[in-house]
Amino acid sequence: MTADGGARPRIRSYVLRAGRVGSGQARALVELGPRFVLPYQPELLDLDAVFARVAPRVLEIGFGMGEGLAETAASHPEIDYIGVEVHTPGVGALLKQLGERELGNVRVIQHDAVEVLTAMLAPATLAGIHIFFPDPWHKKRHHKRRLIQAPLVELLASRLAPGGYIHLATDWQDYAEQMLVVLEAEAQLENTAAAYVPRPDTRPLTKFEQRGIRLGHGVWDLVFRRR
């Protein structure tokens, strides 16, 4: 609460930057946006109607330029994917890939993920949640901005169907350690390993990660399931 009794603003885990939108991305936003982009609305989505079928649904938060999400969706046509991203160049890049690959099992929401989870996705509806390489906010004074905090993890777990999973990945060891502590403290979840897991096939290697591996950088994956 603030001094005047109002609600304290939520600290967001991202900063909106005016990134350059390429010509191909801009064209994809105009031509493919109406098909693939779902406008934010404070009411629950009917996912069966959105995808015109009944299938497992996986949410990916912060898909970046969309390379990994497009690859995963192409490899798993039996699963529907909902990608949430706030940055316009990334949304345009993913739409371009969806068009080129003729993928119909992805929808995009360009909005704050916490608000999407709270208002648009019903409890116990998701088969999985992916959050790969969220901003590490590596300076200690910025750790409060990190996405993976107890309130969000509780919200994420509530949107998973029983047996559904949360898969996190980071290349910052201290963030991986924080993730492990936070997820293990959530009563709705259980770890699928003693601590971290080898990279599952459901997380494709991106060019960024391949470069990091060549430079000797570590990557930590965590997979927890809803009890």
UniProtKB/Swiss-Prot annotation:
Tell me which family the UniProt entry assigns to this protein. Answer: Belongs to the class I-like SAM-binding methyltransferase superfamily. TrmB family.
- Which Gene3D superfamilies has this protein been placed in? Vaccinia Virus protein VP39
* Sites where the protein binds S-adenosyl-L-methionine: 60, 85, 112, 135
Q: Which UniProt keywords apply?
A: Methyltransferase, S-adenosyl-L-methionine, Transferase, tRNA processing
Q: Which residues does the entry assign to the active site, renumbered to this chain?
A: 135
Catalyses: guanosine(46) in tRNA + S-adenosyl-L-methionine = N(7)-methylguanosine(46) in tRNA + S-adenosyl-L-homocysteine
Among InterPro entries, the record links this protein to: SAM-dependent_MTases_sf, tRNA_(Gua-N-7)_MeTrfase_Trmb, tRNA_methyltr_TrmB_bact
Q: Where does substrate bind?
A: 139, 171, 206-209
Protein name, UniProt field: tRNA (guanine-N(7)-)-methyltransferase
This entry's Enzyme Commission designation comes to 2.1.1.33
Hey, which pathway is this one from?
Answer: tRNA modification; N(7)-methylguanine-tRNA biosynthesis
The UniProt function text for this chain reads: Catalyzes the formation of N(7)-methylguanine at position 46 (m7G46) in tRNA.
Recorded hits in Pfam families, A to Z, give: Methyltransf_4
One GO location term (cellular component): tRNA methyltransferase complex
* The keyword Transferase is assigned to this record: yes
Coiled-coil annotated spans: none
Question: Does the keyword field hold Phosphoprotein?
Answer: no
Q: Name one GO molecular function term.
A: tRNA (guanine(46)-N7)-methyltransferase activity
